[in-house]
């Protein structure tokens, strides 16, 4: 019985320690357009972080620099700028997914 309690305590400790890492393992999709563009057409559930604010908000919300971050905008131009900013800050898994339509297609091939 004592071993069971010890094993259970170890498993609980491990699950608590790994929970933040597992939560970040899910890919993040970010709309980097303006609020007005986002209101007109957006993908439900994806955060809006305009490309000019990308570094401050991503480093706060997604501190793990290995998180898969997928960026999109109207044409891919602003997503490219945001990608460069994040990579310069040390993010290692950032993708420019192009337009909103291309991002939808990439998620549901």
Predicted segments — roles?
Residues 21-23:
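Non-catalytic, polymerase-adjacent accessory regions of viral genome-replication enzymes
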Residues 72:
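Short, surface-exposed ligand- or partner-binding patches at beta-edge/loop junctions that are enriched
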Residues 2-6, 25-28, 35-68, 77-109:
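Rhodanese-like catalytic fold shared by cysteine-dependent sulfurtransferases
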Residues 2, 9-19:
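Bacterial N-terminal signal peptides
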């Amino acid at each position: 019985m004592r071993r069971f309690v010890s094993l259970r305590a170890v498993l609980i400790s491990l699950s608590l320690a790994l929970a933040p890492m597992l939560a970040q393992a899910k890919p993040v999709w970010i709309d980097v357009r303006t609020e007005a563009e986002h209101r007109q057409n957006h993908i439900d559930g994806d955060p809006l972080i305009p490309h000019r604010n990308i570094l401050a908000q991503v480093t706060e919300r997604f501190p793990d620099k290995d998180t898969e971050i997928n960026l999109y905008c109207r044409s891919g131009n602003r997503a490219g700028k945001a990608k460069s900013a994040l990579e310069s800050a040390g993010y290692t898994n950032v993708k420019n997914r192009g337009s909103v339509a291309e991002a939808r297609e990439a998620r549901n091939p």
